[in-house]
Amino acid sequence: MRAVLFPGQGSQYVGMGSDFYDKFDVVKKIFETVDKTLDFSLSHIILNGPEAKLKLTQNTQPAIMAIGVSIFNVLKNHFDLNLKNVKFFAGHSLGEYTALVCGGALTIERAAYLLNERGKSMQDSVPFGKGAMIAILGMTIEEIEKEINIFSKKNICEIANDNSNTQVVVSGEKKIIENLNENLKRKKKKGILLPVSAPFHCSLMTKAAENMKDKIYNTNFVRPKPNIISNVTAKEETDINKIKTLLIDQITSRVRWRESVNYMIEQGVTDFLEIGPGKVLSGLVKKINRNVKISNINSIEDIKE
């Protein structure tokens, strides 16, 4: 049994998907649709840069979605991707929107609009330079929760991504995250401050969640096929209204990726296929369970392999 995975922010790079764009009309049509929806040429930024524009979160989010949907459609229409043995789709953060589009729950037009708005809302939720994120390596989530409890009584310092057994990302107020980093150094633990423009997936994003509420609730969804794993509950959700509510909650909640992967394995998944730029999720799955098969498709060459 297989699960298909779609990456989140941080996997983007200028020129991603260019080989698919050059060769397949279906990809050109997807790019044109996204450009028309957003009323500017996101495709030009994806293919040509500049990198600074691609890294703007309101551009990054729909861009990564467009690449994932493009590659998925090429695999389905030109390489006979067998979906009969696919039990789940799962996406990391914004990747959940890619999963919903590929699962037929959401149109690409609406996903592009929502992700562009989501990016703007998340960036505007906290003044620039007031928030930060740190990746902590080599500690269990229980150890990290004890560590951040020292700082989180009066300040915002929360787990944003539970990525694997040995990688957890913490989000919060910049001064507090810097203090946490110093504390980790004193204890000879490894923390990496992330080059992000806002502290995603924590309660500092409350304003963004409020701003997205009506936009998501007013969007027409249909039940996806196959089922989509929610970042918030770490299991499949089929009720449309609950899916909408969880997409809103996701903005301020931790991404429960480790639990999601373990849940899919418990449900019989033995083969994971990552579709989209980079190999981040493939690396995380390997850290979670070395006994499953993992492959990644980011280029036409990957398909040939």
Question: Where does each model-flagged region fall?
Answer:
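Short, charged, surface-exposed secondary-structure boundary motifs
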Residues: 303-305
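FabD-like malonyl-/acyl-CoA
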Residues: 1-144, 271-300
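A short, well-structured juxtamembrane/interface segment
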Residues: 255-263
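Short amphipathic alpha-helical interaction segments
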Residues: 248-256, 272-273, 277
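Non-catalytic positions within long, well-ordered alpha-helices that form the structural scaffold/packing
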Residues: 265-268
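Alpha/beta catalytic cores of group-transfer enzymes, especially the acyltransferase/condensing modules
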Residues: 10-11, 38, 103-252
